[in-house]
Amino acid sequence: MLRKTIWLGQPSTTLSHLPVVQKQFLSAFLILCLSFLISCGGGSTDSSGGGGTGTGGGGGGPIGSPTVQHVGIVVFENQNYADVIGNSAMPYLNGLVQQNALATQFYANVHPSIGNYFMMTTGQVVTTDDNFSGTISGDNVTTALTAAGKTWKSYAESLPQAAYVGGDQYPYIKHHNPFAYFDSVQNDSVQRDNIVPFTQLHSDLSANSLPDYFFVIPNDLHNGHDCPAGGSNCPLSDRLGTIDSWLQSNLGPMLLDSHFAGNGILIITFDESANDNTMGGGRIAAVFVGGPVKNNFQSTNTYQFPSLLRFTLKTLGVTAYPGAAAQAPDMKEFLK
């Protein structure tokens, strides 16, 4: 570059013929230009940071990258955030919190349960009647997944049989299984076959045939709704301890399995708080676990179930979001 003829007022004057002062000026000018070019060629800055803390990575691949192949949700029942996070009765779950990511300001949308299950899967409350026995038409998480060529399953503990869309068979409770209400599932035998007993999850994991999206439904003895032996007369620590041990025994092995650990995300949450009405359904825990999730990360941004629905779809590369999920705040900050 310095061999090129440079014009400074006289024709055919090259660098070697310039006076010392001009050489110094030109050298400084060239260094300044080079510095400018280097600074312009640097990496871009992502300005979409969220209100989070921790040691998570700074950006990684975009949501929907091939590194995320499975997204699952397990939903427990009726517990306040403050009763779950940091509670010594739940050492396994709180250990996962320390290693993964936590939404510290996550709120259910409504009371009672059923409206939150529908919000997680349709982006609408639909009803607040836990005894609702109708069917639901329109877009939902399964129609969005199917249209995008993705697979799904609902793994329900104590489900009487595969493809069952009937009423309660205690300790299986229908209104904890929103998929059983969708007409797009009820009227299609292929879709209906995606509602399976929970035991099928272990078989699918062993066969490396986990679906892209899955929803785990513990029964009422294990989800914190009832006491472990039935009924409602037991200390809270008994219910929380049962949730924790069930989670560790039944989903802990999956989190360590090579078919899931590196490319899967499990979201552990609750349908509603026990006695808090903040933002409709109260503050609840939402824990994000898996290889693609930031480590030791805590978000202080406010979210509700429409954002969770959006996250589960968008992370798998789906671009159509039902109901309120279409405009819900993005949760991409939880990914590496």
Give the role of each language-model region.
Residues 23-31:
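Sec-dependent signal peptide recognition
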Residues 7-8, 15-16, 33, 47, ...:
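Serine/threonine-rich, low-complexity intrinsically disordered segments
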Residues 36-39:
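C-terminal motif of bacterial Sec signal peptides marking the signal peptidase cleavage site
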Residues 1-22:
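N-terminal secretory signal peptides that target proteins for export/translocation
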Residues 42-336:
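N-terminal pro-sequences and low-complexity stem/linker regions of secreted or lumenal proteins
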